[in-house]
Regions:
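Helix-terminus/linker motif at the lipid-water interface of multi-pass membrane proteins
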Residues: 32-50, 120-127, 183-190, 251, ...
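Transmembrane helical elements of multi-pass membrane transporters/channels
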Residues: 18-37, 150, 173, 202-206, ...
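Small-residue hotspots at the loop-to-helix junctions and early N-terminal turns
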Residues: 47-58, 133, 137, 196, ...
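Hydrophobic transmembrane alpha-helices of multi-pass small-molecule transporters
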Residues: 62-65, 109, 177-181, 207-211, ...
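Small-residue-rich hydrophobic transmembrane alpha-helices
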Residues: 50-110, 147-166, 279-337, 341-343, ...
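Short alpha-helical transmembrane segments in multi-pass integral membrane proteins
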Residues: 1-23, 78-143, 187-247, 305-371, ...
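Short runs within selected transmembrane alpha-helices of multi-pass transporters and secretion channels
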Residues: 71, 140-158, 166-174, 195-210, ...
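N-terminal transmembrane alpha-helices
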Residues: 7-45, 58-73, 77, 81, ...
Length: 451
């Protein structure tokens, strides 16, 4: 299962490619979780069900963010320890991250289920969409713990030198989700409950695959027993605090997508009603695919940057960063062109032309796609600062992008530009973030030159 990878001496381009290809493929399979639900729900149940799933989406983006936070933080810490020859410490770090995040998500899941109807209303559900939103959450929330294990396990398995197996975990989960979606929705007629249950079973299988690898097949990083003495628990909490500090910007990145969905749902339902939310939901199904590709590029660069940062090899860090930025920009431009040229085809994947939401989405997606180019630069910039233990800077960038600039976009543009302004809110957010990252980069260069 282990691939031939040496983070400290292998050619950067070769090393990056070895990590990138299976990681991107794995992320594409992860995206199938998202897009398959959208296609089957839209085609098999209707636009109201599509809107209801989008209403609940911010909750699941938050859950994904928790997994990314612990995954990124633990991976950075473990990478640096591995570069210093501390294998046992690295294994303890990843075990603590998985155990603590699983406990946290179980507690949050119980609270969400207890307050499920008020939660659906808080997320913006109308009376018409409420029964569908509640039903979807009721069949997905109980299984979120496996989604967390799958998310964190991906980082650990790639760091262990097995990106291909990490890809397979996502692939098996996604393929199972597709098969079960078709059976539950079209053959058994289980409706939105079937869509939620299919996704849940897929994540259960993927999560178990990661646990089996870390328990039985890993060669460097192993799950180990956590001591329950007071001293050990205090050390665990200290380590968890540092992991959260390093990975918090990853959580905020995911939470910013949740914020985008929440604000977008709120603004669209005010201006265009449920049809507007259904149209926006198509963009929200498409956006995570873009996010996952950029995230795959950032995640492929992360262990290389972290390892060589810990080993004191700045030139290898610089080469990896530049390669990641070039790769992300090529993808961003390609995604934008694809969105403009294939807009109607993308929308028709989810809903028929007979729905009013179809024309709203076709007219709006090209505006929305402008942001994909700037989003590419932003993801790599945030990932770089995480990888070199500058978590505070990464967190500030992510907060500006996910909250401050997003609020400016959604509430400043619509009064001026009307409906196109709603679609352009996210691109404006990404553009402002790119300007900020470029500004601090120039500031850092100026300080270095003065020295």
């Amino acid at each position: 299962m282990k691939d031939s990878i040496d983070f400290g001496s292998m050619n950067i381009s070769t090393l990056f490619r070895k990590l990138l290809i299976p990681t991107v493929l794995g992320m594409v399979f992860s995206a199938l979780f998202v897009i398959t639900d959208g296609i089957f729900v839209g085609k098999g149940i209707g636009s109201d069900a599509l809107a209801a799933v989008n209403i609940t989406a911010p909750l699941f983006m938050i859950a994904a963010g928790i997994g990314l936070m612990f995954g990124v933080g633990a991976s950075v810490v473990a990478s640096i320890h591995l570069s210093q020859g501390k294998r046992k410490v690295a294994s303890i770090n990843i075990t603590q991250a998985i155990a603590f995040s699983a406990l946290l998500i179980l507690i949050l899941s119980a609270l969400c289920l207890y307050f499920i109807e008020p939660l659906a209303r808080l997320l913006g559900s109308s009376d018409r969409l409420l029964p569908l939103a509640v039903e979807y959450m009721a069949w997905y929330i109980p299984f979120l713990v496996f989604y967390e294990v799958l998310n964190i396990g991906m980082f650990c398995i790639r760091l262990d030198g097995s990106p291909t197996y990490a890809m397979m975990c996502n692939a098996v989960a996604a393929i199972l989700n597709i098969i079960l979606d078709y059976i539950f929705i079209f053959e058994l007629g289980w409706g939105i409950m079937g869509a939620a249950f299919a996704t849940s079973l897929g994540t259960v299988v993927g999560g178990l695959m990661t646990l089996i690898y870390l328990l039985r097949f890993s060669r460097t990083l192993h799950l180990c027993r956590i001591k329950l003495s007071i001293k050990s628990l205090l050390l665990t909490l200290r380590n968890i605090g540092y992991i959260i500090k390093l990975g918090s910007s990853a959580f905020i990145s995911e939470a910013s997508i949740a914020c985008m969905m929440f604000l977008g749902n709120y603004v669209f339902i005010r201006h265009l009603g449920e049809d507007g939310v259904a149209a926006f939901s198509i963009a929200c199904y498409f956006f995570p695919i873009i996010f996952m590709v950029y995230n795959a590029i950032a995640q492929s660069a992360q262990p290389i940057i972290s390892y060589n940062f810990g080993a004191g090899q700045p030139e290898r860090v610089r080469k990896t960063l530049h390669l990641a930025i070039r790769t992300a920009l090529i993808c961003g431009i390609s995604f934008f062109i694809l969105t403009v040229l294939c807009c109607q085809d993308i929308v028709s994947l989810f809903i028929d032309r007979s729905y009013a939401a179809f024309d709203i989405a076709v007219n709006g997606l090209p505006y929305f796609g402008v942001g994909f180019i700037f989003f590419a630069v932003n993801m790599i910039g945030i990932g770089y600062y995480q990888s070199v233990e500058r978590g505070q800077r990464a967190t500030i960038i992510t907060l500006l992008r996910g909250v401050v600039f997003m609020l400016i976009g959604f509430f400043a543009l619509p009064p001026v530009l009307g409906i196109p302004g709603i679609w352009l809110a996210v691109p404006l957010t990404e553009l402002l973030t790119t300007f900020y990252i470029f500004g601090i980069y120039l500031k850092d260069r100026f300080i270095v030159c003065r020295r």
